[in-house]
């Protein structure tokens, strides 16, 4: 049967494009995110940002690799994850309008039309009948082994000559569903038919002809080019995180510190000024206090609740960025994100919130007014203590600036690590629910225990920002910090008496983790220096995993009885 009788099914929706939209240049990143109003923070600018180039787009072209149907039937059913490179890398979305197709290609299409099997055409026609859509007949280019399907798409929103649906995840009403399906549910089936996202292990991507390369360089088409600039597996992860944060764009990197440092270097000019808070991750503080001054960048440090101090700083200095955690590490202080964003934006200051302790489920910093959100994806987002990663979420413009520098500095996330995070995120909502619950219940128990002198947890009324946390968070997190009623030796005995948690420097995973910050993070400093940061020898930070609450409770209580 002739190719012209083929009708393209609805799998070519606008939602399907972003999952494997090739993005190697910084201005080709990001896409609109659907969902509730809380998540649609930057949607207006993002819709048109997914497609760039000088020519108007009247169609989209998917290029299948040689013998695609045969490969799919033989390999995909047997081992979808190993199809990866050949089929995904070969799938390129072209910006060339259909009218620009060369006459030679048109002739090739005509000559090869009869080679398409009637069975394939019938199956396609059946799919089209089940889900009708305004479609143009496909065009086959070059040979029977390389099909290029050109399809007009359902009209909901039209920008120029590109037709897009107005809501990418309109059928997903909760963050829990987004953690499972965002970035994956739509679109990938046209490449592998695999439920899970394939891992694309390649360092570079090839162009079949020099003309393709020139089209790419002159932005008439988009494609992956080099592994440091983008990867199909990594793009799926970025889209999933963007959906949760309500961001136009997300950039993933090799670690949380990589994300923080590249963000600071990209957005704060030499001679600029930063405002941060007293309580924060020590390595972040070291970078700001020891390395940024070499670029002439100065830092003002304020208490997380010191709004007057923030106003004084932005009025006195030309502040480029306000950067803090919320909740903070290790005392879980909370910053009024909405208020500080209003104060900073009046003076042209950007706001970046490290939301690692909150997760995108417990707090939507972009919806509260922040310009950027940083996460150590090593923690809750990955959630299994088996991968290092970091991410930056925000507007397309800001993330693109950071991506530009990232392409130069490196720190690229390995696609295997990206896959582990994608898989881990499918249970993020379940894990966080359990961790929120266990942490809250244990915080109440610890606060009432005679051998605990103080508990730091935003879910407790005794916390200085408890009312603020109730306003801007939907859950209080899975980490509780507390002080044992005793000295460092007593605290060590408590920690060593625990049987369930690991003594380790991380948090947010399925396994419970405990540490003494005075030893784990500040042991190189004398006690008087540690006290400047509020780090007492009897301070304990406990990250609750997903173990049964009663087991964890019994373990902590027996350890307290042992001291």
From Swiss-Prot:
A DNA region of the first exon coding for a conserved motif of 11 amino acids in CGS1 (positions 77-87) is required for post-transcriptional autoregulation and acts in cis to down-regulate its own mRNA stability in response to excess methionine. This conserved motif is dispensable for CGS enzymatic activity and only found in plant CGSs. It is unclear whether the transit peptide cleavage site is between Phe-68 and Val-69 or Ala-90 and Ala-91. The modification N6-(pyridoxal phosphate)lysine is found at residue 379. Its cofactor is pyridoxal 5'-phosphate. Binds 1 pyridoxal 5'-phosphate per subunit. Coiled coil: none annotated. Pfam families: Cys_Met_Meta_PP (PF01053). SUPFAM superfamilies: PLP-dependent transferases (SSF53383). This is Cystathionine gamma-synthase 1, chloroplastic. It comes from the Eukaryota. InterPro entries: CGS1/2, Cys/Met-Metab_PyrdxlP-dep_enz, Cys_met_metab_PP, PyrdxlP-dep_Trfase, PyrdxlP-dep_Trfase_major, PyrdxlP-dep_Trfase_small. It catalyses: O-phospho-L-homoserine + L-cysteine = L,L-cystathionine + phosphate; O-succinyl-L-homoserine + L-cysteine = L,L-cystathionine + succinate + H(+). Changing residue 84 to D: In mto1-3 and mto1-5; over-accumulation of soluble methionine. Optimum pH is 7.5. Inhibited by propargylglycine. Pyridoxal 5'-phosphate binds at residues 226, 228, 256-257, 281, 376, 378. The keyword Mitochondrion does not apply. Gene3D superfamilies: Aspartate Aminotransferase, domain 1, Type I PLP-dependent aspartate aminotransferase-like (Major domain). One of its GO terms (molecular function) is pyridoxal phosphate binding. Its EC number is 2.5.1.160. Catalyzes the first committed step of methionine (Met) biosynthesis. Catalyzes the formation of L-cystathionine from homoserine esters and L-cysteine, via a gamma-replacement reaction. Substrate preference for cystathionine synthesis is O-phospho-L-homoserine (OPH) > O(4)-succinyl-L-homoserine (OSH) >> O-acetyl-L-homoserine (OAH). Is able, at extremely low rate, to catalyze a gamma-elimination of OPH in the absence of cysteine to produce inorganic phosphate (Pi), 2-oxobutanoate and ammonia. Pathway: Amino-acid biosynthesis; L-methionine biosynthesis via de novo pathway; L-cystathionine from O-succinyl-L-homoserine: step 1/1. Keywords: Amino-acid biosynthesis, Chloroplast, Methionine biosynthesis, Plastid, Pyridoxal phosphate, Transferase, Transit peptide. Belongs to the trans-sulfuration enzymes family.
């Amino acid at each position: 049967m002739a190719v012209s009788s083929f009708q393209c099914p609805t799998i070519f929706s606008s939602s399907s494009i972003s999952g494997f939209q090739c993005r190697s240049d910084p201005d080709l990143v990001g896409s609109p995110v659907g969902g509730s109003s809380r998540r649609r923070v930057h949607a207006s600018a993002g819709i048109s940002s997914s497609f760039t180039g000088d020519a108007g787009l009247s169609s989209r072209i998917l290029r299948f690799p040689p013998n695609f149907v045969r490969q799919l039937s033989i390999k995909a059913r047997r081992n979808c994850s190993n199809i990866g490179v050949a089929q995904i890398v070969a799938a390129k979305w072209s910006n060339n309008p259909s009218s620009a197709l060369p006459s030679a290609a048109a002739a090739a299409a005509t000559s090869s039309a009869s080679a398409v099997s009637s069975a394939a055409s019938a199956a396609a026609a059946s799919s089209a009948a089940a889900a009708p859509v305004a479609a143009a007949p496909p065009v086959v280019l070059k040979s029977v082994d390389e099909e290029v399907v050109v399809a007009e798409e359902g009209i909901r929103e039209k920008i120029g000559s590109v037709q897009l649906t107005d809501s990418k995840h309109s059928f997903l009403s909760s963050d829990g569903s987004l953690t499972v399906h965002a970035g994956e549910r739509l679109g990938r089936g046209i490449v592998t038919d695999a439920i899970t996202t394939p891992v694309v292990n390649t360092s570079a991507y090839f162009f079949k002809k020099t003309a393709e390369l020139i089209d790419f360089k002159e932005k008439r088409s988009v494609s992956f080019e080099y592994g440091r600039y983008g990867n199909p597996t990594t793009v799926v992860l970025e889209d999933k995180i963007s959906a949760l944060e309500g961001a136009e764009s997300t950039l993933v990197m090799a670690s949380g510190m990589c994300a923080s440092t590249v963000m600071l270097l990209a957005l704060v000019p030499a001679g600029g000024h930063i405002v941060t808070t007293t309580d924060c991750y020590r390595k972040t503080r070291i970078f700001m206090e020891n390395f940024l001054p070499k670029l002439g960048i100065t830092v003002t440090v304020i208490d997380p609740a010191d709004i007057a101090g923030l106003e004084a700083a932005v009025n006195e200095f030309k502040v480029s960025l306000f950067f803090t955690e919320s909740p903070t590490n290790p005392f879980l202080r909370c910053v009024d994100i909405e208020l500080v964003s209003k104060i900073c934006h009046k003076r042209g200051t950007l706001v970046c919130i490290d939301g690692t302790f909150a997760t995108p489920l417990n707090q939507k910093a972009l919806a509260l007014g922040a310009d950027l959100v940083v996460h150590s994806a090593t923690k809750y987002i990955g959630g299994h203590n088996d991968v290092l990663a970091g991410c930056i979420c925000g507007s397309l413009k800001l993330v693109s600036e950071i991506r530009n520098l990232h392409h130069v500095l490196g720190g690229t996330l390995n696609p295997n690590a990206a896959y582990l995070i994608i898989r881990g995120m499918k249970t993020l909502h379940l894990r966080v629910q359990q961790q929120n619950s266990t942490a809250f219940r244990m915080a109440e128990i610890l606060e009432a225990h005679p051998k605990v002198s103080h508990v730091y947890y935003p879910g407790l009324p005794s916390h200085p920002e408890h009312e603020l946390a109730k306003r801007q968070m939907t859950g209080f997190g899975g980490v509780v910090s507390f002080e044992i009623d005793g000295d460092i030796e007593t605290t060590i005995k408590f920690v060593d008496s625990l049987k369930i948690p690991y003594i380790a420097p991380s948090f947010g995973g399925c396994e419970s983790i405990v540490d003494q910050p005075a030893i784990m993070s500040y042991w190189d400093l004398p006690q008087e220096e540690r006290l400047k940061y509020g780090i007492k020898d009897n301070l304990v930070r406990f990250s609750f995993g997903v173990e049964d609450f009663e087991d964890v409770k019994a373990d902590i209580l027996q350890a307290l009885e042992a001291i």
